[in-house]
């Protein structure tokens, strides 16, 4: 799919048709070339491909106002098991539902997506405030849990948490769909403890805010979105995910920080819900993580050494942190985000055997009650299970 990179933007209809091999950065750049008041409800990593990102849900900085990428997909093209190219009308609503959050690779080969563009102001405001535990960071995180899901829908404040100089550093990273003065007024009412000032903030076009969240310096040209990847080719990466439905107590946070400091190399990102994410029913798409979730957690670890020992060492560090978080996250099942592929939560046997019972172990975590409908769609469109992988959706006969 790497060569399928065409992007067609129709500002009159406020839509974009993007082929599955195009990256998010390429899509953001193309939209910005056509309009300064339209954006895309997608993620913050410019080099991520749109084909898989949209197929698994696709969340980003405007999800509290506009929902996920899949909530804004209005058409798609897919190659089915018979080699036919289908659009929304010819594939039918059940298959169209399944590929928007259920992972397109279980059902066929996604060629392209058509999505609604969302309205953004000509100027947005961003900030990044860093606070250590010694600077009151833990109390701010506790407050953030109450505030962030209930802020004005134009405000998105994520937490990036890492270990620096033997302590926890929490970065409060914000995008606001508006000017700085309005943001300061809203923050003073809702989160004065953060101590935000005008000098902390930057006003810039929406497309440049995507570079800010990708950790490019302020002033970086929009063409940087077209770069293939900022990750060193020789690096290795493992990720996991969680959903939090109840505020973690101050005492609970202390236990999290203790283990986190011991790990040294893990990064956590906490992404707030609320707003539009609480409006959309869990069954609207296969992505079920909606009402009831305060925020989502992504755990990340990166290393640069080759070999099995390095893999096992870093996997064990991440798994240990994940275990410590068990009391604080969703249960029965412990939910996970499809796009953060994680074989630890279940996978089909290595001998190629696939069945519904085995798939339900991971499927319920990714899709909750939507798993059974995904199996029904799979049974209808791919009964012989031609499209399969370690965590795919199986048909009923298997």
Residue ranges of predicted features:
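Soluble FAD-dependent oxygen oxidases
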Residues: 1-398
């Amino acid at each position: 799919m790497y060569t399928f990179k065409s992007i067609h933007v129709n500002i009159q209809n406020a839509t974009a048709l993007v082929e599955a091999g195009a990256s998010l950065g390429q899509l953001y750049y193309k939209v910005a070339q056509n309009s300064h008041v339209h954006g895309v409800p997608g993620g913050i990593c410019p080099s991520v491909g749109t084909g898989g990102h949209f197929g698994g849900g696709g969340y980003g900085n405007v999800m509290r106002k506009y929902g996920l990428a899949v909530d804004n997909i209005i058409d798609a093209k897919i190659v089915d098991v018979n080699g036919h190219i289908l659009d929304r009308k010819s594939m039918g609503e059940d298959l169209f539902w399944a590929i928007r959050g259920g992972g397109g690779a279980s059902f066929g080969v996604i060629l392209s997506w058509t999505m609604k563009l969302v309205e953004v102001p000509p100027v947005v405001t961003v900030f990044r405030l860093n606070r250590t535990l010694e600077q009151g960071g833990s109390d701010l995180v506790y407050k953030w849990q109450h505030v962030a899901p209930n802020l004005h829908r134009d405000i998105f404040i994520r937490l990036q948490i890492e270990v620096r100089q033997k302590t926890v550093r929490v970065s409060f990273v914000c995008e606001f769909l508006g000017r700085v003065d309005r943001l300061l007024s809203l923050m003073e009412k809702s989160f004065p403890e953060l101590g935000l000032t005008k000098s902390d903030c930057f006003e810039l076009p929406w497309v440049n805010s995507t570079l800010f969240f990708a950790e490019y310096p302020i002033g970086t040209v929009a063409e940087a979105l077209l770069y293939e990847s900022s990750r060193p080719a020789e690096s290795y990466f493992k990720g996991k995910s969680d959903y939090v439905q109840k505020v973690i107590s101050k005492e609970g946070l202390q236990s999290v920080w203790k283990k986190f400091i011991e790990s040294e190399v893990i990064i956590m990102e906490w992404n707030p819900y609320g707003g539009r994410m609480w409006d959309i029913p869990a069954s609207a798409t296969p992505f079920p993580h909606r009402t009831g979730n305060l925020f989502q957690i992504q755990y990340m670890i990166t290393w640069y050494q080759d070999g099995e020992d390095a893999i096992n060492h870093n996997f064990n560090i991440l798994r240990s942190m994940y275990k410590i978080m068990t009391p604080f996250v969703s249960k029965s099942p412990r939910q996970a985000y499809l796009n953060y592929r994680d074989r630890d939560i279940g996978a089909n046997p290595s001998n190629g055997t696939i069945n519904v019972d085995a798939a339900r172990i991971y499927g319920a975590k990714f899709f909750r009650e939507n798993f059974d409908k995904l199996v029904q769609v799979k049974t209808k469109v791919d009964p012989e299970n031609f499209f399969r992988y370690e965590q795919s959706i199986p048909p009923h006969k298997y």
